[in-house]
A protein has these predicted regions:
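Transmembrane helix-loop-helix hairpins at the membrane interface
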Residues: 86, 121-228
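Short, Lys/Arg-rich, polar N-terminal cytosolic tail immediately upstream
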Residues: 1-10
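Residue-level signature of transmembrane alpha-helical entry/exit and packing/kink sites
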Residues: 9-17, 44-48, 73-81, 123-128, ...
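Non-cytosolic membrane-interface motifs at loop->transmembrane helix junctions
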Residues: 37-46, 110-111, 184-188
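Alpha-helical transmembrane segments of multipass membrane proteins
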Residues: 23-28, 50-51, 84-92, 206, ...
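Alpha-helical transmembrane segments in multi-pass membrane proteins
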Residues: 11-63
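Juxtamembrane/transmembrane-helix boundary motifs at the membrane-water interface
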Residues: 24-44, 103, 212-228
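Juxtamembrane helix-loop-helix connectors linking adjacent transmembrane helices
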Residues: 37, 66-135, 220-228
């Protein structure tokens, strides 16, 4: 049996992971996509609410440290997460600059790409704050702090990291390279730092990057469309 030092969520078994993911994919996700998408906002976030309830149950059986919130090596984890996320966000600027410098901006694919504006209304601000802060936090605790660690207990780190990437990409019935890369990278960061902080920061950076593509760099929608 493989262990992960002080960070394995020992109370969460692979069997519990299978049951948790089965309920999510067979009940929660179909319900959200079929029945809940036109209902009040709490039901639109049924998946996040489900993740949150599972997190509360996991915390009842363990503690924050076992889910990855250890203060050991905190500065290193924050640096690695910030550096990884910073590289991702800065790469958007470089890619957009590349479109201009190579002349691709004159191609029909990159013309007439409208910039979306971020509304200053209170509801919009709350929505963006949720997308950038709350959702990454909940998803990382669930997918990395709980699911990845339970898989890591029974298999090698490499297989666990790849499995986490696949599971995350399937979480929304949307098998994409971007989703797989996010799940893979956050699990790898967790394995590297032994904490969840770097994974959360990187996920936040991805959420910020997605908003930047929609609002500041709309041409990258075409350039990076294969990822999503």
């Amino acid at each position: 049996m493989h262990t992960n030092g002080n960070s394995c969520c020992a109370t969460w078994s692979v069997r519990a992971t299978i049951v948790t993911l089965s309920v999510y994919h067979l009940l929660v996700l179909p319900g959200k996509n079929i029945f809940f998408h036109t209902n009040p906002w709490p039901l639109k976030y049924a998946d996040s609410i489900y993740f949150f309830l599972i997190i509360l149950f996991a915390l009842h059986r363990s503690n924050l440290k076992e889910l990855g919130f250890s203060v050991k090596g905190l500065k290193r984890s924050l640096f690695i997460g910030s550096a990884s996320g910073g590289v991702l966000v800065f790469s958007l600027f470089l890619l957009d600059l590349c479109i201009d410098s190579t002349g691709m901006a004159n191609h029909d694919l990159f013309k007439n790409q409208p910039n979306l504006t971020i509304s200053s209304e209170k509801n919009s601000i709350i929505q963006y704050a949720g997308l950038v802060l709350v959702i990454p936090l909940i998803e990382q605790i669930f997918f990395t702090g709980i699911i990845y660690q339970s898989i890591h207990k029974k298999t090698s780190p490499i297989l666990a990291i790849y499995a986490s990437g696949i599971i995350y990409s399937l979480a929304g019935y949307k098998l994409s390279l971007g989703s797989f890369g996010l799940g893979f990278t956050t699990s790898f960061l967790f394995k590297t730092t032994k904490t969840i902080y770097a994974s959360i920061i990187f996920h936040v950076s991805c959420a910020v990057g997605e908003i930047m593509i929609k609002t500041i760099y709309p041409r990258l929608n075409t350039f990076l469309g294969f990822l999503f």
